[in-house]
UniProtKB/Swiss-Prot annotation:
Keywords: ATP-binding, Cell inner membrane, Cell membrane, Membrane, Nucleotide-binding, Repeat, Sugar transport, Translocase, Transport. It comes from Mesorhizobium japonicum (strain LMG 29417 / CECT 9101 / MAFF 303099). It comes from the Bacteria. This is Ribose import ATP-binding protein RbsA 2. The keyword Transport applies. Its EC number is 7.5.2.7. It catalyses: D-ribose(out) + ATP + H2O = D-ribose(in) + ADP + phosphate + H(+). The gene is rbsA2. ATP binds at G39, E40, N41, G42, A43, G44, K45, S46. It is found in: Cell inner membrane. One of its GO terms (molecular function) is ATP hydrolysis activity.
Amino acid sequence: MTQSDFFSLDGISKRFGVVQALDNVSIAFRPGEVLALVGENGAGKSTMMRILEGVSGPDTGTVRHGSTPIVFGEPRDSHRAGIRVIHQEPEIVPNLTVAENIFVGELPRLAGVLLDWRKLEEQTDRVLATFGMQQDMRPRQLCGTLGPAQRQMIEIMRAIRAGGRLIAFDEPTSSLTDDEARRLFSVVRRLREKGTSIIYISHRLNEIIDLADRIVVLRDGRLVDDSPAAGASEQTIAKLMVGRNIDDLFTRETWRSGEQLLDVAGLTTDRVNDVSLRVRRGEVLGIAGLMGAGRSELAKAIVGYDRRIAGTIAMNGVPVLPNSPHAAIVAGIGFAPEDRKHEALLLFRSILDNAALCVPDKTSSFGFFNRRKAMEIVSPLAAKMSIKAPNLDEQVSKLSGGNQQKVVLARWLARQPMLLILDEPTRGIDIGAKAEIYRLIDELAASGIGIILISSEMPELIGLADRVLVMAGGRITAELARPDIDEATILKHAMPQSASSPGDYIQ
């Protein structure tokens, strides 16, 4: 390995208006090494990726290959240099085939005109065989029929086939099952063995410790640590990310819950089978289970998104009309869905518009939106939740994942619900934003609001919930109360009957 093999950033700075996104950052990306890039949302990770991709250039500083400065006028220049970024949401064309997506831009043609399908299929079969994907997809299969893990693999295969020498993975496991994530880790390790430089970005610190050779920490646009991964702990990484101790992520006491609030009896949908549950005021009820257990479907049935086949729902003893999200809102139920980008937010509207969405009765005058009234409601909520944005007119699509989630929560706080259902509320957000959301859950429960917390993160359920219901196959298989809420017990009841051991499903 020589200096000429390295990609590096040398004194990179980038400013957007008053925000210093990167401040004199220098990093070397070595062949055959997995470099984990961590930091809170807004630390500068995305800006660094945009510079490496050629989407935007640095204000000062240099991108180098070996000792040679390289300038990217557009993403194509970055690709030619051998740099590829595998985004959290894979960039594939759903109405094109697997083969066309893998070889996009370099499709073999007959006489320079007609697509040479025979040659394309042969080339694609070789690529699929190299990655052991022959059973997962076919060359002529439309990519719109593939799942998230398969679409991600297409991006990886495209990057390697095109000669990718530095490959960045941006939150690659955010939408993968445990088995799919393990498969991805194997691919990353194989790439490392072949001498590829890897940048791995993730908020899941356990993944970082497991995969990385070196960990680089960004905070407020500055590089604050660049150290070997050996010996690192989640606690030390988190402290470097946020600049303070966060040992007490879960500070919740077991609050004295009040009278019964929600009563669900015999609820049945296409994916939920005869579920009954109760939630009291001030109680945090956790819902645990593996992917496909029916947790999200249960939440959507309660709030009227999914069609109710049988069963009843009542708030404060008053029946809630079936299949009506509006009826659920009127009854005092708020819902923050797992897929906030597609199911909760108007991405190209402002923070103000999104946060005021559920209180039209308080933000309108004579049938028209009243900005002054909306500002009076939303401004204190944005301040309370520390939403990081220049102002409330900022487009939600420009916010980090943590701040987008805060906007969703602010919307429901404006509505002042009696019950709030949170489906994977901390998925894809950094450790600092997680701590803020945990504190908010504490405060809401202490104020008497009932919380249903659906989470795949065991520490959240163990640290926040008063009771945990475990689901498998659309049914509730166990109810656990403190002090009997622990990971082993949850996993035992979450396993389908066919599972031989927890290792078959959970890493």
